[in-house]
């Protein structure tokens, strides 16, 4: 496997950063993909597009995770997204903290601030509709708090969603959060964590 590595000089602006893209496949028709800076710019991008009946019926079920890190009274957002507001496109530019992107069959991001740095790793399990995302604090205050906001969906990977189509039955058991789409109650999207606690939040939509 060839390793590809890029640094900040390769994404001097948000628009430059979405010109290069990556993809990882799971061997049964499912995949993950996004831009080099982690901002989605196409309907078929996300952390897990699952093939419900391999190798067809591809559905986006897990879009991404937005991250904020709090140290003391300071909170930094690493969200990298584009939104429509007041008739124009606005950007959240977490890529300004991104110092390294590596693709070696899996995906590795390195983020740095004046006070801390961390790595984010994304990969898919072979022959299964499973995505693993890992975070590793590599420098700074070990007492910092990571807040992870996962974004879920349930749509055919070339279609678009509207708020009225994003309806789920949700519940939590042990360290697992379950989402059952109203459009297909025969499946369940499961989100598991190795540590931390689940917190209620307002509904958030992303493009």
Regions found by a protein language model. Name each.
Residues 1-207:
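Terminal accessory carbohydrate-recognition/targeting modules of carbohydrate-active enzymes
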């Amino acid at each position: 496997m060839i390793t590809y590595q890029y640094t900040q000089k390769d994404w001097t602006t948000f628009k430059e950063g979405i010109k290069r893209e990556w993809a990882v496949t799971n061997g049964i028709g499912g995949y993950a993909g996004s831009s080099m800076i982690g901002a989605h710019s196409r309907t078929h991008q996300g952390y897990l597009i699952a093939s419900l009946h391999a190798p067809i019926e591809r559905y986006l079920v897990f879009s991404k995770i937005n991250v904020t890190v709090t140290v003391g009274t300071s909170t930094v957002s690493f969200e990298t997204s584009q939104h429509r507001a007041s008739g124009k496109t606005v950007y959240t530019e977490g890529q300004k903290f991104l110092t390294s992107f590596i693709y070696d069959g899996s995906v590795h991001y390195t983020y740095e601030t004046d006070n801390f740095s961390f790595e984010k790793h994304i990969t898919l399990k072979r022959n299964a509709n499973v995505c693993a995302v890992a975070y590793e604090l590599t420098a700074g205050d070990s007492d910092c708090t990571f807040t992870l906001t996962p974004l879920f969906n349930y749509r055919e990977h070339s279609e678009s969603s509207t708020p009225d189509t994003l309806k789920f039955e949700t519940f939590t058991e042990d360290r697992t959060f379950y989402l059952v789409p109203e459009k297909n109650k025969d499946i369940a999207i499961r989100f598991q964590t190795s540590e931390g606690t689940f917190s209620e939040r307002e509904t958030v939509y992303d493009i």
